[in-house]
Each structure stands twice: as structure tokens, then as C-alpha cells.
Design a protein with these regions (language model features):
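Transmembrane alpha-helical segments that form core, pore/gating elements
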Residues: 37-40, 49, 60-63, 122-124, ...
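Specific transmembrane alpha-helical segments of multi-pass solute transporters/efflux pumps
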Residues: 31, 35-36, 64-115, 151, ...
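Membrane-helix interface residues
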Residues: 46, 106, 132-134, 189, ...
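Hydrophobic residues within membrane-embedded alpha-helical segments of Major Facilitator Superfamily
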Residues: 24-27, 31, 38, 58, ...
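C-terminal-most transmembrane helix of multi-pass membrane proteins
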Residues: 2-14, 55-57, 65, 154-155, ...
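Hydrophobic transmembrane alpha-helices of multi-pass small-molecule transport proteins
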Residues: 57, 63, 117, 125, ...
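Juxtamembrane helix-entry segments on the extracytoplasmic side of multipass membrane proteins
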Residues: 17-22, 45-53, 76-82, 154-176, ...
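Helix-helix packing/entry segments at the starts of transmembrane helices
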Residues: 52-54, 92, 96, 108-117, ...
Length: 319
């Protein structure tokens, strides 16, 4: 009786942990998705590099306080400078910089869909860099993703010349971030320390470039702009990182990656509601193709990792 009750209690705790994990993922996806129209509105008052860099540095300060409160060390190990610089360039400077720049030329919904093709680019880049050939399922996913991009811009017919810099910026963000997932090994730092240091190293040059090239007017920020700035600092780069790490403690990484496919969906819908951006048959078809394609890509990757783990386990047992 005791064994049954203890097993039931463990199952109950497992279900509860998974429920909390999925709730954390929904908060993460919603926070990141809503940030797309928020950034688009903020760019009417502050230029992209300066705005995103300032928000990143403010978020780094908040995360540093969180790390201190939970007892995480912020000390950098010796010899980590080069790895940290490369990681910060790909994961923060290129990702946040090009993402925000893209919104100067394309809509928030278009930017969200283009940027979140990064798993597809990671799959393509892993082939020449590590010799990992895509599985057939993943190839189907790649075709669907690129079909979705073409659909989004009407097969290229609806792509205006003035949108091209935005499309290239969004794709640069996706490709460089994907490159970072392949060539940059995890930093030997605690989670919040790793994010904080990357934000600092990546956002300082962003602010410097913004001051030198964009000449921002600090007093141009309205009350609404300040509220959006606070949201961009606290929610996507603060709360969402907290909920993301909380979800990873309760759910497998593959599951977490799949659920975050909600982010571009939420971004497109939020942009349609808040900014009146188009949300018709073409946008819906592009969403289905891109998100469906990414689901194929991620499932193919998780299956390959699972088979690799099983093979290593069999080898271990045979030794």
C-alpha cells in the first residue's frame, strides 16, 4: 500500500512538474512573441541599435541581481574571453542587432517568421561544418520552411525593393544565431551568469554604434515608448529567460524547442491585433508552412540525438 501511494505521489509530482514546465514555456513564447510589435512601435521613437542595446544592458543588470540573489557566481574563468566574445557576437550582437534592424523595413509579423527559421539554417550549416547530413524528415521540413518564406512574400512578386534590406537583416540574424548553436560550445558558466555576460559584451558595442551612427534623441522617448522599453527589458530579456530555464529543468530540451514554435505565431497575431498588420490567407499559409517545417526539422534532430544516445548506451553495455 505504501509503495503504491509513494508511486502515485511521484507520478503526481511528475505531472505537476510538467504542467509547470509547459506553463513556463507558454509565458516564454508569449513574452517573446508580443515583443515583435512592441519593438516595431518603439522604433518610431528610438533607433534600432541604440534601443535594443540599452534594453539589453538594463536586462543584464536585472539578471545579474537575480544571479546574486540565488547565489550564482558571476566570476569569469581564466581564458574564457575569446569564447565569450564569439558567443556574444553571434547570440546577442548579431541576433538582437539584425533582428531589430530588420523591423525598419519589414513588418513585425514578417520579421518574426523570417527570424525563427534559425533551426532550419542550423540543420543546413551542420552538414558542411560537422558532416551531419539532414534526415529525410528534416529535408521535408527545410522545403516547407522555404516554401513558407516564398509564400509570405507572394513568391517574390510581393517583395518590394525597399523591403529587401529587412529580409536580408532578418535572415542574417537567423543564420548567424544558427551558426552560434553549431560552432560555439556551451560556456562554462552558470545559466544566468552566461546570459548576463553575453548581454554585456554584445550590447556595449551595439549602444556605441547606435550613438555614433544613429544619433538618438533621448528626449524623443514618450511615456508609451518608455513603457515599451520597460517591457522589452523586463519581459523578453528578464522574465522569459527565468521561465525558459525553469521549463528546461522540468521538460526535455526537444519538447521545449517544439513549444517555442508558438513564438512566431504569437508574434504574427499580436502584430495583426496591435498594429493592424495583414493576417489573411497568404500569411496563414506562410505560418502553417514555416511552423510545420520547423516542427519536422526539430523532430528529425531529436530523433537523431535519441538514436545516438541509444547507440552510445549499447556500446557502453558491450564494453
Amino acid at each position: 500500500m505504501t509503495d503504491r501511494s509513494s508511486q502515485g505521489g511521484e507520478r503526481g509530482r511528475g505531472v505537476s512538474a510538467r504542467a509547470v514546465g509547459f506553463l513556463c514555456l507558454f509565458v516564454t513564447s508569449a513574452g517573446w512573441g508580443i515583443n515583435w510589435p512592441a519593438m516595431k512601435v518603439l522604433l518610431r521613437e528610438w533607433p534600432p541599435l541604440f534601443a535594443r542595446g540599452v534594453a539589453g544592458l538594463a536586462a543584464a543588470a536585472i539578471l545579474a541581481v537575480v544571479a546574486w540573489r540565488i547565489g550564482e557566481s558571476m566570476r569569469l574563468p581564466a581564458g574564457i574571453g575569446r569564447r565569450l566574445t564569439v558567443a556574444a557576437f553571434l547570440n546577442v550582437f548579431a541576433w538582437m542587432g539584425f533582428t531589430t534592424l530588420s523591423l525598419t523595413w519589414v513588418s513585425a509579423g514578417q520579421g518574426a517568421l523570417l527570424v525563427y527559421t534559425m533551426p532550419a539554417w542550423a540543420l543546413l550549416l551542420a552538414w558542411p561544418i560537422h558532416g551531419r547530413r539532414p534526415e529525410p524528415r528534416a529535408v521535408v521540413g527545410l522545403v516547407l520552411c522555404f516554401a513558407g518564406i516564398l509564400t509570405l512574400f507572394g513568391g517574390g512578386i510581393a517583395l518590394r525593393v525597399d523591403q529587401l534590406p529587412g529580409v536580408l537583416s532578418a535572415l542574417a540574424a537567423a543564420i548567424l544565431f544558427a551558426l552560434g548553436t553549431i560552432v560555439v560550445a556551451p560556456l562554462p558558466l552558470a545559466p544566468f551568469a552566461a546570459v548576463t555576460w553575453q548581454l554585456v559584451v554584445g550590447c556595449v558595442p551595439m549602444v556605441a554604434l547606435g550613438l555614433a551612427l544613429e544619433h538618438p534623441r533621448i528626449d524623443a522617448l514618450s511615456t508609451r515608448g518608455a513603457a515599451l522599453m520597460a517591457y522589452m527589458t523586463i519581459v523578453p530579456m528578464g522574465v522569459c529567460y527565468l521561465t525558459w530555464f525553469a521549463a528546461l529543468r522540468r521538460l526535455p530540451g526537444e519538447v521545449a524547442s517544439m513549444v517555442t514554435l508558438l513564438t512566431p505565431l504569437i508574434g504574427v497575431i499580436a502584430a495583426a491585433i496591435a498594429l493592424g498588420e495583414p493576417l489573411g490567407a497568404r500569411q496563414a499559409a506562410a505560418l502553417v508552412l514555416v511552423i510545420g517545417g520547423l516542427a519536422f526539422v526539430l523532430r528529425g534532430q531529436s530523433k537523431k540525438r535519441r538514436l545516438g544516445s541509444e547507440e552510445r548506451a549499447r556500446r557502453g553495455r558491450s564494453v
